[in-house]
Amino acid sequence: MPQFTAIREESTFVDLQGVTIHRYRWRPGRPKAVVLIAHGLGEHALRYEHVAQRLVQAGYAVWAIDQRGHGATGVTQHGGDLERLGRLGPGGMRAVVGDLVHVLKQIRAEHPGLPVAVLGHSWGSLSTQILLNGYSDLVDAAILSGTAYRMPGSMNPGDLNARHAHLGDTGYEWISRDPAVVAAFAEDPLTFPAKVLPLFGVADGLRLYGVPRRIDPPIPMLIAGGSDDSMAGPKSLRRLGDAYRSRGGLTDVTVTVYPGARHEILNEINRAKVLDDIVAWLDARLLPA
C-alpha cells in the first residue's frame, strides 16, 4: 500500500439547492498553485487520494468534492441508501456544474493570486467542459482525463465494458489493466456502474452533449486518455483538441494518448508516468519561468 504523507482535511458546505456537499483538501506548506479534481460517474473523490498526494509532493494544493449523488455526498443526500447513489437530485447537471463553480470561487478566495487548474476525469471532464463554456475566467489551466468530444459518434452511450468483458467477470475490466484497481472498484460500496440514462434521465443525459465555446482569455489545456478507452478513444480526443483550437480559440492544447491504457489513466499500470507527465505539464504552464 502507498504511504500517504499529506493530511486530508474534510469539510462540507450546503449548495444552492440545499444539498450537503462533502469537500476534501490536501495542502503543502507553501502551495505554488491549486488543482481542483472532478471525479467521474460511479466513483468518488477519495479514489484520487494518490493523485492528490503526488500533486502535493510537487507543491500543489489540491481540492476535491464528492459530487452530487456520489461518495459521502450521495450517502448523506440519499439518507444512507446506497441503491440511490448516482442520482443527482434537485438541479441535476446544472447544479453539478454550479457546485464546481462554487468551489472554484472558494479556492480563489482562500488562495488569492495563485494559479488554479481543474483536473476532470470522465464525467468530471465533461462537467469541466461545460464549466469552461461559462466560467473559464475562474480557471488558469484545464486537464481533461478519460474524456470525449461531446457529440454523438464521439462518445460511447452504451455498454462501456462490452469489448473487455471476456477479460473478467466484474463488469469493470474496461477501467484499467491493473487487476488490483478493478478488484478494488468492484468491492468498493461507493462505486457503481456508469449508466447515464437510468441515473440521470434523458434531460440531464442530453446536457452532457455540446461543443466548446470561445475561451477568453485562452488557457492551456491537456487532453489525455488511453488508446483502449471504450468511452471515447484517440479519435475523439483529437477531435476535442481540434474543437478547442478552432471553436475555443486555444493555442496551447496538448493531446496525449497512452498506448494500451484503458479508461482510468490515473489508475493504470503506468499511472506513475501519467502523474509525472501531469506535474511536468502543470509546472511548465503555471509556474514562473
Predicted segments with their positions:
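Serine-hydrolase catalytic core
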Residues: 177-250
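Catalytic active-site module of serine/aspartate enzymes centered on a nucleophile-bearing elbow/loop
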Residues: 247, 251-289
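Alpha/beta-hydrolase active-site loop
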Residues: 85-109
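Active-site glycine-rich loops that stabilize anionic/oxyanionic intermediates
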Residues: 32, 39-43, 122, 227
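Conserved alpha/beta-hydrolase
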Residues: 52-82
